[in-house]
Amino acid sequence: MGLKVNVSAIFMAVLLTLQTPTGQIHWGNLSKIGVVGIGSASYKVMTRSSHQSLVIKLMPNITLLNNCTRVEIAEYRRLLRTVLEPIRDALNAMTQNIRPVQSVASSRRHKRFAGVVLAGAALGVATAAQITAGIALHQSMLNSQAIDNLRASLETTNQAIEAIRQAGQEMILAVQGVQDYINNELIPSMNQLSCDLIGQKLGLKLLRYYTEILSLFGPSLRDPISAEISIQALSYALGGDINKVLEKLGYSGGDLLGILESRGIKARITHVDTESYLIVLSIAYPTLSEIKGVIVHRLEGVSYNIGSQEWYTTVPKYVATQGYLISNFDESSCTFMPEGTVCSQNALYPMSPLLQECLRGSTKSCARTLVSGSFGNRFILSQGNLIANCASILCKCYTTGTIINQDPDKILTYIAADHCPVVEVNGVTIQVGSRRYPDAVYLHRIDLGPPILLERLDVGTNLGNAIAKLEDAKELLESSDQILRSMKGLSSTCIVYILIAVCLGGLIGIPALICCCRGRCNKKGEQVGMSRPGLKPDLTGTSKSYVRSL
């Protein structure tokens, strides 16, 4: 009984030590042909955005300073008009070409709002982003009453940052850039400073504020229809505290970084008031949705040698797994961080069955291609072990000073601390850890996949050969076309006469040929009979004279 328990324990220990595939990708078999995974992360997609209105009041309330700051305020208003009027004209050009579409209900004969139509003929040239932004502008046109109420509220407030909540609507954040300076610096010192000095200080502060607005909100001011907002502008608009965005939307620090790097936060100017000097922006914060069960893996490859030829395995740079399914992953719209992968759109698309078999451990399904020049990695560090193609680069044990030679029967060398604690490869010194990969991968034990050509030089050469062959085929086709055209030039009656003459010649010539053949055969038979007479008689014992007479 004890023996059975020991055998079972040993069997379970062996099973636990075997290298098994994780996440449907057989990293053990892939490492034999130089493919390793260098990272995995969760998968998040940006979905429907939540919007917040941001109002920037460029003109502060200076009721108590009117007598001392008239010249500075007049100059500041002139500067603001040079910025705001072009933006207003651009917004008007878009909003004037948008009209609502109303439908008539079947049960009740009244009109209701159904959507908007963009007058493309009158608008001229517009990008897709500008058209989308134009539709969003129409929503701000419907909120004109709310904007009027907002203007009235801001005329009387002296707060630098104020949250105004409209009835039944979202919160609107109002920002007045220099109001704190006026409230805390200029007004308390009115009795100590002269009127000219107060005006000069306010003028310098307004000019600095004007410069900050141009630099921070530059993209929105240059392209008011479709623009993006920077992290600096967002922080400035929220009073210098970016944590307000995190608290409001429930973002983590990594999520916000991913959204900013992928340009997920959009800010569009929806309204400009040149009388009250207001800019209304609509800021869209996307919502992140984590796709449960989807893991994004990054793959890297190392070249390997078969004799004097250097190869590498062709696999995608990124793949995704979900259960048993393995999918391709388009990283063009994604941002990669240690906390996860954030994509602005769905990046998954189907993978061919042959490539799935390759990633599941069937090395004979993995295509390979020749290395061109210095292309490709020749060593990589994975799980503390160094996987190197020591047949193409110099591998040296830094601890002992000896050269690490690669057996010709091996395609790669796996170096761990039991072999050499410190390795120098291609001029780089690396300290390796305990062994995680077996250094017993021989060529005759691996089923390699089919070779393919992917190098730019080969593709160009093959393309040139194909073009040359097409040119030759074109010349042959042109010559055949000339023959066909010459044949078409003959009349149909001539062709009929030629066919009749050929048939008559055949009818006359065939019997004559048969007669000639028979005559020649008869002559040959007579010549054979004369040259070969019958058997000679036995002349033994006959006299010579008789023989002569014969």
UniProtKB/Swiss-Prot annotation:
Residues 519-550 are cytoplasmic. The keyword DNA repair does not apply. InterPro entries: Fusion_F0_Paramyxovir (IPR000776). Residues 138-166, 462-487 form a coiled coil. The inactive precursor F0 is glycosylated and proteolytically cleaved into F1 and F2 to be functionally active. The cleavage is mediated by host furin during the transport and maturation of the polypeptide. Gene3D superfamilies: 1.10.287.2480, 6.10.10.110, Head and neck region of the ectodomain of NDV fusion glycoprotein, Newcastle disease virus like domain. Homotrimer of disulfide-linked F1-F2. Class I viral fusion protein. Under the current model, the protein has at least 3 conformational states: pre-fusion native state, pre-hairpin intermediate state, and post-fusion hairpin state. During viral and plasma cell membrane fusion, the heptad repeat (HR) regions assume a trimer-of-hairpins structure, positioning the fusion peptide in close proximity to the C-terminal region of the ectodomain. The formation of this structure appears to drive apposition and subsequent fusion of viral and plasma cell membranes. Some hyperfusogenic isolates can induce membrane fusion in SLAM- and nectin-4-negative cells and are linked to fatal subacute sclerosing panencephalitis (SSPE) or measles inclusion body encephalitis (MIBE). The neuropathogenicity is closely associated with enhanced propagation mediated by cell-to-cell fusion in the brain, which is principally regulated by hyperfusogenic mutations of the viral F protein. Cell-to-cell transmission of the virus also occurs with hyperfusogenic isolates. This is Fusion glycoprotein F0. The gene is F.
